[in-house]
A protein has these predicted regions:
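Short alpha-helical segments enriched in small residues
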Residues: 1-112
Length: 112
């Protein structure tokens, strides 16, 4: 789990330019996180979740509950955008469930 932008760059290889231009909560960041964690772990599968669980941090363009989930399987990466409802804990729990569902679908597509 990398909350800080510095950790995203240092451990997952997220580009500083990405964070400066589109922000930490973005499709590009989720993609780079998923690919970076797979690379760092020497794994065929990587998951990156970035979002605004709230409260706080919202902007007119990015509301609380906005989540991007990236899943990378064997170098193929897909990112989904979600606008989730609920309090901070509910948003986090729902994001994890959506991420696991995405992993399952990606594995089925890759291996069947």
């Amino acid at each position: 789990i990398t909350y800080a932008n510095e950790a995203k760059m240092k451990y997952l290889g997220v580009k500083e330019e990405t964070l400066n231009t589109v922000g930490a909560v973005s499709e590009d960041t989720a993609r780079q996180m998923a690919e970076g964690v797979a690379r760092q772990a020497g794994s065929n599968v990587g998951v990156g979740i970035t979002g605004l669980a709230g409260p706080g941090g919202e902007t007119p363009e990015k509301k609380a509950g906005l989540v991007y989930i990236g899943v990378s399987v064997n170098g193929k990466t897909k990112v989904n955008k979600y606008q989730l409802n609920g309090n901070r804990q509910k948003v986090r729990e729902t994001a994890v469930c959506r991420a696991l569902t995405m992993v399952r679908h990606a594995l089925v597509e890759e291996f069947l």
